[in-house]
Amino acid sequence: TLPDHSLESWNTVAISASVHVDADTHIEFVTYGKHADLMGALLLAPLTGNGNRITRPLKMLGNIIRHPLRFLRMLWPFGWSGRTLIILVMQSLDNAIAFRAKPKLFGKGIKLVTEQDAEKPNPTYIDAGNKAAEYLAEHTNGIAQSMSLEAMANIPSTAHILGGAVIGSSPADGVIDQNQRVFGYQNLLVCDGAAVPANPGVNPSLTITAMAEKAMSAVPDKR
């Protein structure tokens, strides 16, 4: 986030550039536009290094104590999105999160919660992302920030939840067929990120679009 309120980073396309920093890691630079200051509430934590659920909050607290004025400037939300460049870090590694149903704490019914996949947990810290944030902050005199949940609870965040509707040859080994039709249901197709069978390591929007177009091409014309 740029500290000078006279400077703005929003007056460009939403995703302005990208770079592959290593064989597995791809970084995109994103702006939210001028009227998304509420998103700043998700990022109001100083950039915090690697650790666990005990050490990362302590590192964050230490950062606040060392730089109190910088932290106070972070808490001012007005104009945040117009002065902030988001670093979207993606990796092509095979990792996963799992969904499970959990009874609601209050009232009836269930809710979906996420948890780390036991065999392929997704990372809670990506060093390349932190280094990119530090580099940009140094060269723009800006303030580098972390997602609040990552800094305070060592819980990662994701914008691209992919998979879940497995492509198979029958209901015994999949949810959808090669044309993304749900087994056992007529005229029901899965055309969102749930149908993507692997992690592309880049923004999946074009992959999802291409797969949706392929699925639609197999739908018979209405006569």
What are these regions (language model features)?
Residues 2-5, 186, 203:
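Glycine-enriched catalytic-core subsegment of oxygenase/oxidase enzymes
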Residues 85-88, 111-198:
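A glycine-rich dinucleotide-binding beta-alpha-beta segment and adjacent secondary-structure elements
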